[in-house]
């Protein structure tokens, strides 16, 4: 009876310990209690060459190329189109300004796309083929778990 109880307690502690993940914990330096990125101090850069032209990126937290939590912002020109693609992990998007449209499927069309405006939030499921359009100059914020990848559909 004691062995069964001990095993149950150990199993409960193991499961509880596994359910707690440090993925959302920020790596603060000693004595630092907040990470802030004021809008006027964001470091905007051209998007990587594997992404379509017409976008800039600012990394707010983490590294989207490495394992772990990250948050980035994208500035998109009004004619920006992200062709059909997938991501290996869920993609969490907040539209900060402008207008975005998302269509699903390898042949998704702009006419069949769902529209999102400033203040809207959506999550695209991992593995779902989708195309993204900016209807006007836009800024979006993406939070996810890296490494973040976009696999384009030929």
Functional labels for PLM-detected ranges:
Residues 82-84, 102-103, 124-125, 129-135:
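Short beta-strand His + acidic residue motifs that chelate non-heme Fe in jelly-roll/DSBH
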